[in-house]
């Protein structure tokens, strides 16, 4: 059975929770062994896949995990706003470190490497692809290229103001267009995750609400202030 078929079966049987194990950069939790522990805990609690950033983290997580890993590399570039897996060598490094699925910024912004070239390199390694999109048009374009997973990852993050609520309308429109939608971005409660599924998402990625202790503590700290 192919990886995609196994993942489809897992989503059908266990629900579509994907956990993004990305600690706050530079925080006490930002260590590969802690990221690996987070990933193992998430998988044991029902996550059908995990999303891991960085080669060292990925190499540490891979031996301990049987569920699929979505791999990314984040960079801060001077000549482009694109941050997620911008280079061909990033794809190569993620493949060699054990990623099953490689996600990349698929927005229609200035970029060092075009989407088709990134997709071709992912296919060269025999891996699945995920397009992190900011708009419906970007998602449909990537779906038409044969990209397996269309994420709403960048919705609300390419403009000056980030909304509080997730973009459920984008989920609905992409689902109606036939995309295998991974809802991602501001799904920080079980109710919002359930709403994404109700709006047609194939799976939902949750990050900060599960793996960023600093964010969770701040939510509670602000709530109990007098």
Swiss-Prot record:
Reactions accelerated catalytically: an N-acyl-D-glucosamine 6-phosphate = an N-acyl-D-mannosamine 6-phosphate
GO BP annotations, alphabetical order: carbohydrate metabolic process; N-acetylmannosamine catabolic process; N-acetylneuraminate catabolic process
UniProt-listed Enzyme Commission number(s): 5.1.3.9
Gene transcribed to yield this protein: nanE1
UniProt signal peptide: none
Protein species of origin: Salmonella paratyphi A (strain ATCC 9150 / SARB42)
Entry function: Converts N-acetylmannosamine-6-phosphate (ManNAc-6-P) to N-acetylglucosamine-6-phosphate (GlcNAc-6-P).
Protein name: Putative N-acetylmannosamine-6-phosphate 2-epimerase 1
Class of this enzyme: isomerase
């Amino acid at each position: 059975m192919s990886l995609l078929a196994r993942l489809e079966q897992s989503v059908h049987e266990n629900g579509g929770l994907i956990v993004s194990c990305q600690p706050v950069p530079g925080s006490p939790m930002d260590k590969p062994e802690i990221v690996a522990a987070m990933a193992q805990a998430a998988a044991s609690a029902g996550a059908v896949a995990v999303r891991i950033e960085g080669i060292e983290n990925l190499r540490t997580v891979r031996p301990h995990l049987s569920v699929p890993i979505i791999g990314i590399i984040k960079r801060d570039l001077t000549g482009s706003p694109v941050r997620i897996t911008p280079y061909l060598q990033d794809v190569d490094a993620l493949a060699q470190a054990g990623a099953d699925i490689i996600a990349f910024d698929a927005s229609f912004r200035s970029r060092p490497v075009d989407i088709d070239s990134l997709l071709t390199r992912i296919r060269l390694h025999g891996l699945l692809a995920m397009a992190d999109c900011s708009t419906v048009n970007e998602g449909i374009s990537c779906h038409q290229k044969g990209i397996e997973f269309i994420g709403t990852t960048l919705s609300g993050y390419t403009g000056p103001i980030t909304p509080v609520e997730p973009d459920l309308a984008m989920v609905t429109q992409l689902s109606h267009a036939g995309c295998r939608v991974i809802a991602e971005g501001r799904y920080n409660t079980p109710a919002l995750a359930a709403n994404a599924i109700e709006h047609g998402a194939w799976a939902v990625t949750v990050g900060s609400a599960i793996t960023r202790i600093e964010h969770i503590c701040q939510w509670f700290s602000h709530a109990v202030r007098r």
